[in-house]
Amino acid sequence: MSSNKNQSDLNIPTNSASLKQKQRQQLGIKSEIGASTSDVYDPQVASYLSAGDSPSQFANTALHHSNSVGYSASAAAAAAELQHRAELQRRQQQLQQQELQHQQEQLQQYRQAQAQAQAQAQAQREHQQLQHAYQQQQQLHQLGQLSQQLAQPHLSQHEHVRDALTTDEFDTNEDLRSRYIENEIVKTFNSKAELVHFVKNELGPEERCKIVINSSKPKAVYFQCERSGSFRTTVKDATKRQRIAYTKRNKCAYRLVANLYPNEKDQKRKNKPDEPGHNEENSRISEMWVLRMINPQHNHAPDPINKKKRQKTSRTLVEKPINKPHHHHLLQQEQQQQQQQQQQQQQQQQQQQHNANSQAQQQAAQLQQQMQQQLQASGLPTTPNYSELLGQLGQLSQQQSQQQQLHHIPQQRQRTQSQQSQQQPQQTAHGLDQPDAAVIAAIEASAAAAVASQGSPNVTAAAVAALQHTQGNEHDAQQQQDRGGNNGGAIDSNVDPSLDPNVDPNVQAHDHSHGLRNSYGKRSGFL
């Protein structure tokens, strides 16, 4: 039995091994090349082949081996089929992706083409709009030229009528006619006030008639000639108003009308008044009044240019009536104020005179003191009538100062101030070292009179001459100060021209009265 088994073992592998190798080779070739599913291993065929080759005793073992080999072959075939299916799915996915990419590219191309078409269409529309606007401008320009050409004869006609109206020579027998034709637009305005002002102040004088308002409505104002019969007037009395109306009633057919034309925006805003931009003032500003001629023909002659008109400015304006008691009260107040002003002026003049008199008295007292001091310092003998001489000098100085104050009160203040300002430094500077020439002349005259025993009248005459000399010198000095020193050195007109100009004229007169003609050289040293 054992020997038979060994033989069978030795015999079987030869056939089975060859079969397995063949099967493995076939499976390897299929796996490498990727054979189709038609080359599948059949276990029945394999078992039939093995049974035909092997003997009958070994039939069971051969079938067992063939079954195992068949299962492995079927597994390999299933794996190959799965791989083939996976590859097919991968290929299908690749094809789908390619189709999607192709579709996306087509969509992009379509969109680009559509955008280009839209841009071209928009450009064409813009070009058409520009062409349309250019054509409209050309049409408007042509219409404007045509209107100007058509208006030229009308303008020439209006200018001719205007020239005829502006000339002073016009036929009073012909009826007045406007320079505007029927249904012609005269002018446009932005407000009703401008319209009325133009018609009243400009159009009326140009038309040689007075234009009045017949009726006024919110959207229309009707104008007519004053002589048409019914018009507005400011006369309150009914009888006077009726008389004025009848005097000017002539049934004139001259008519004008002004209509209000609101803008389209205002019409739209009326439907929506709640908008924030809606404003009544803006709507008023945007309104437009159009003045149009209805009937340019009058039935009367034009008013003459030199027509006498009542001048309102020539009337005198009276604030309150004169006959009322209040006016008398005002007049009395004015008179009282004038009297008070006069009294104040008189008081001021009296105060000025009083001040001037007091200043003159002070000056006279100062002069007397100076003379007494100079006499005491000179050491000359006093005369019995020297006190009378001083009294007469004071009285004469007061009289002359009063006369000068009556005629030259305003000048006296300046002169006294300048004299005081000049006398004070002179007195402090010079003192008794340099005596006055007039005082020395008076002292010498008094001494000579005492020696000659001619009495007190000569002494007084000498003193008077000395006083006149001092006053004349002061008067000349004041004139020189007022005139700026231009007439310095002028001789008084009251002095005799035969006197020596180098010697004091008062001293010369005194010497002539005493017969002293050859003593000028001695006294000239004191001058």
UniProtKB/Swiss-Prot annotation:
Annotated region Disordered: where?
1-36, 258-281, 328-365, 395-433, 470-527
Q: Which UniProt keywords apply?
A: Activator, Chromosome, DNA-binding, Nucleus, Telomere, Transcription, Transcription regulation
Q: Where is the composition biased (Basic and acidic residues)?
A: 263-281
Presence of keyword Nucleotide-binding: no
Q: What does this protein do?
A: Transcriptional activator that binds to the RPG box and to telomeres. Involved in the regulation of the transition between yeast and filamentous forms and plays a role in virulence. Induces expression of HWP1, a major hyphal cell protein and virulence factor.
- What positions does the DNA-binding region cover? 160-300
Q: Please provide, alphabetically and separated by semicolons, the GO molecular function terms listed in this UniProt record.
A: DNA binding; transcription coactivator activity
**Family (UniProt):** Belongs to the RBF1 family.
This one is known as: Transcription factor RBF1
Name a biological process GO annotation: positive regulation of transcription by RNA polymerase II
Cellular component terms per the entry's GO annotation: chromosome, telomeric region; mediator complex
Q: Where is the composition biased (Low complexity)?
A: 332-365, 395-428
Protein localization: Nucleus; Chromosome, Telomere
The lineage's top-level taxon is Eukaryota
Q: Per its UniProt record, what InterPro entries does this chain match?
A: Mediator_comp_sub12 (IPR051647)
Q: Which organism is it from?
A: Candida albicans
